[in-house]
C-alpha cells in the first residue's frame, strides 16, 4: 500500500496458508529490498512453508509498471513520477513478478466470480485504481495504462490530485478523503459514522455521491458489472442500497455489481 507490507501465502486452490501485515513504508532502495527479503524468509519460517514448493513471489504496487516488470513508470502515491528502475527486487531469491495492485485485485475478483464474465474493477484504497477484464483477459491499453479510473476527471477544476491535476476521482474517493480530512484512521471514521457523528456523515454523503457518479461513468463506457475492492470496500455493505439508489438516479439503465 506504500505504508505497510502485506504478505500472503496462497496455494493453487486459492487457499490462504498464511497472512501477515507489517509496518514497512515503501522505498525503492536496495536496503528496502534486503529488509523485504528478510521479512519474507521470516514469514515462510513462521508458517512452516516448504521453500522447495514455492513457485514464485508476486509483488503488487499502486502504480504503472513497465511491460518488462523492471521499472515503475508512474506511481504518485509512492512518490514516483517518472520511470524508475526497481532497485529493491535484486535481494529477493525467488522468481518474482511485479504488477499493478488494481490489475491483480481485478483478476482475483474476476477469478472468484460465478460465470466469469467481463467486468470492471474499482479499487478504493489509499489511492484509487482500476482494471478491466474482457472475457478473462486483462485489457492494458497501448501503453499499459488502461482503466486508471482514479485519474478520470470527476469535477473539472476541483481538488488537486496527487498526480498534479485537479478534479480526479482519486482526490474525492480515496480512503484518504475519509480518514486524513478528519484526522482519523479509516476504522475510526466508520466507527464515528456508525455512532452518528455529523461531520463524518456529511463527508460520507459527499463520498457516496461522487462514487455513484464514477460508477455511472465507468458503466456507461464499458457496459459491464463494476466490482468495488480495496480497503474502503469492506465498509460498503451497509450502504449498498443507498449507493445503488444514487447510481439509478444518475442512470436508470445502469446495473452495478459490487
Please describe what each predicted stretch is:
Residues 18-22, 27-32, 86, 94-199:
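Glycine/GP-enriched mid-protein hinge/lid loop-to-helix segment characteristic of carbohydrate kinases
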Residues 1-3:
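N-terminal helix-turn-helix/winged-helix DNA-binding helices
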Residues 61, 124-126, 230-231:
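Short secondary-structure boundary segments
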Residues 30-50, 169-171, 177-237:
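Adenine-nucleotide phosphate-binding core of ATP-dependent small-molecule kinases
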Residues 6-10, 131:
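Conserved hydrophobic/aromatic positions in well-ordered beta-strands
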Residues 16-120, 238-253:
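Glycine-rich phosphate-binding loop and adjoining helix at the ATP-binding site
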Residues 12-13, 68, 134-135:
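Short, ordered coil/turn segments that flank beta-strands lining enzyme active or ligand-binding pockets
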